[in-house]
Amino acid sequence: KISIRKIAKRAGYNSATLYYYFEDLEHLILFASIRYLREYTSALARNIKKGMTTIEKYRTVYETFNHYAFRSPVIFHNMFFGKYSPMLLEVIKEYYDIFPDDLEGHDELLRGLLTQGNMYSRDKQIVDQLVSEGTIEDKKSDITLKIIISVHESYVYEAMIQGDKLDLDSHE
């Protein structure tokens, strides 16, 4: 089992040093997990094609998200839905300050999506565009957004619980 003490020992630090910077193990894991976004954003840049409609982009965003989230469900659940997920915006800003090239190849809509700290803010930008295009009714946009996020949160949670028993093909 992983612990702050074990991480500190392996890194050559006293555990008190890590506790100075991180509240607990989940907080530390949130910061360490951000590197998983690099693979996700690179895949997203490859998967989003010029000329795609907004709805096609949105589907592709979630297909790509699911691909990576189902393979590392504990990490993705912790990042987007866990105890410290409200801090994700701060962590993402720091990450993209260090690795701005990870936003290359994305249009303005997707750059906005990738730099948001929570799923609601992230997806709202795309749903608002879908409303302006007439794909979703304005009065139904908020509930649509909440349902989409809740469904994906439950999928990632299920993947986390099932572990290796999860049939990835049927969930993607």
Map each language-model feature to its residues.
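Alpha-helical structural segments
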Residues: 10, 27-67, 71, 78
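Hydrophobic/aromatic-rich alpha-helical bundle segments in the mid-to-C-terminal region
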Residues: 109, 120, 129-172
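Amphipathic alpha-helical interaction segments
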Residues: 6, 60, 64, 78, ...
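Short, hydrophobic secondary-structure boundary micro-motifs
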Residues: 3, 77-79, 88, 139, ...
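Amphipathic alpha-helical packing segments from all-alpha helical-bundle domains
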Residues: 86-132
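Helix-turn-helix
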Residues: 1-27, 31
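Helical hydrophobic small-molecule/effector-binding pocket
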Residues: 59-98, 120
